[in-house]
């Protein structure tokens, strides 16, 4: 299953890593370990942040991914199940059926 992980690096930790010239190597190491389908970096509430789309076959993998981000970057994370438009299309009949049961 595809998940989007949003990670927020505390400003102090990000600054320390940037000053030590280790921020890029830490992020590259995490990218090699997690092998995201897509990765984007930005800011959230003024802090360095990233959006990683990863495939997770077993929910138990989430803990290992979280620890990688906690230990490597001191990051706080959010994990959300995401779908492509095609996957959403496949889910639509079940969504509509559930909505009709709720109304019924």
Mark where each language-model region is.
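Conserved, structured core segments of small domains
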Residues: 1-104
